[in-house]
Amino acid sequence: MNKYLEYPEVESKELPPQKLVVLLHGVGSDGHDLIGLVPYIKNDLPNCHFISPHGIEDYDMMPYGRQWFSLRDRSPHIIAKLIANNISKLEDIIREKQTELNLTNKDTVIIGFSQGTIIGLYLTLIQQKPLFCTIGFSGALIPPMKVNNKLTPICLIHGELDQVINVSEMYNASNYLSKLNIEHSGHKLTSLAHSIDGRGLEIAINFINTCHNIV
C-alpha cells in the first residue's frame, strides 16, 4: 500500500456498495474535514461507500494541513501544470478503492470543496471512461490541455457571499462546460459564504439520486 492510501472512510449502509463517493477537501484541511458530512447524507445514499483522501502534499503556507497542489503562484497556467503533475497520485487512490470494492468509474462520484473542486473537475475532464457524476462546492475550473470526458454530468454549488473564491467562478465554469456541451447545472445559494450548508447537501443528494449510469 502506498503512503497516500491511508484516509478516513465510511462503509455503505447497504452491502455490497453500488457507488464510491470520493470527497476532496479544500487547501489547508485534510480528509477528516469532509468525512464529517457523511452522517448528514448517508441515509439518503445508502448504497454509497465514502472515502475522504488527504491531499497528497503538506500545506506549504502553514505548518499543518494538506493540499492537492500549491497556491503560492495562483496563475492559472501554473496551477494547471501543478495539477497535471499531481493528478496521477489522486487517480491511484481512487483506482485502489475501486478495485477493492469491485467498482469502476461509472460507479464513482466525485464531490469537491474549494481546491478539492478544482482538482475534482480537472480529474473528471481527463478521464478516458466517464464517472457517474461530479459535484463541486465553492470552487473553480482550471481546464486541462485535453478534455477526454464530456459525458459525466456536473453540478456546481456556490455561495453568493463567497470571498475566497468568487461566485463568478461558477459562471465561468458553466460557460466553459456549455461550450463543450457537457451536461451541468449551477446553483447560487443566497446568504452563504465559502462553506457547505444544508441546502447544498440537499442539492448534492438529489443530483446523485437522479443521475443515471452512462453506458
Swiss-Prot record:
Uppermost EC category: hydrolase
SUPFAM superfamilies (alphabetical): alpha/beta-Hydrolases (SSF53474)
Active site: 114 (charge relay system), 162 (charge relay system), 194 (charge relay system)
Disulfide bonding pattern of the chain: none
EC assignment: 3.1.-.-
Keyword annotations from UniProtKB, A to Z: Hydrolase
Gene3D superfamilies in the record: alpha/beta hydrolase
InterPro entries linked to this entry: AB_hydrolase_fold (IPR029058), LYPA1-2/EST-like (IPR050565), PLipase/COase/thioEstase (IPR003140)
GO molecular function, one term: hydrolase activity
One Pfam family this sequence matches: Abhydrolase_2
Family stated for the protein in its record: Belongs to the AB hydrolase superfamily. AB hydrolase 2 family.
Protein name as it appears in the record: Uncharacterized hydrolase RP744
